[in-house]
């Protein structure tokens, strides 16, 4: 199902935010300054991950397969990845990390299969608590190669 969405881009000091509104809720994805958001770049798979995620969220909600509430997790079937070239297999909806975002917003945070498995075994709140080991930038900004809080233990952050 192809869903047409109207993404709003808000620019802040140090980052940009893509916002899609549905059913009175804002779904947001924060992007680092270097992220290319011009029309030509959005045609490139490397840069259109945020738009694809927003389209997926809207489609899943309209299909009744995802509730627009904190803690909702989506995982692609059969180990498929969200986008070619990444190991991200799903996402979670959480209250926004950055200050100044209103209460009717949910942030889309892409997840690795190990993080999804952890959330299903231990609960999404435990996963959210694990995110404290990431810097605000690592968690807040979308990144196809983000640190995996379950498998990537580097001594600086002893997650488990």
Stretches found by the model and what they are:
Residues 1-13, 22, 27-160:
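Acidic, proline/glycine-rich low-complexity IDRs
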């Amino acid at each position: 199902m192809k869903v047409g969405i109207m993404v709003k881009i808000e620019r802040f000091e140090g980052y940009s935010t893509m916002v899609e509104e549905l059913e009175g809720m804002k779904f947001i994805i924060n992007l680092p300054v270097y992220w290319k958001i011009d029309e030509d770049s959005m045609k490139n798979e490397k840069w259109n991950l945020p738009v694809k995620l927003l389209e997926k969220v809207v489609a899943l909600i309209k299909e009744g397969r995802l509730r627009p509430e904190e803690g909702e997790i989506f995982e692609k079937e059969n180990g498929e990845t969200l986008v070619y070239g990444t190991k991200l297999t799903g996402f979670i909806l959480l209250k926004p990390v950055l200050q100044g975002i209103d209460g009717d917003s949910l942030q889309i945070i892409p997840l690795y299969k190990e993080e999804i498995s952890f959330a299903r075994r231990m609960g999404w709140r435990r996963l959210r608590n694990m995110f404290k080991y990431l810097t605000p930038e690592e968690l807040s900004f979308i990144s196809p190669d983000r640190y995996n809080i379950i498998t990537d233990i580097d001594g600086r952050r002893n997650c488990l």
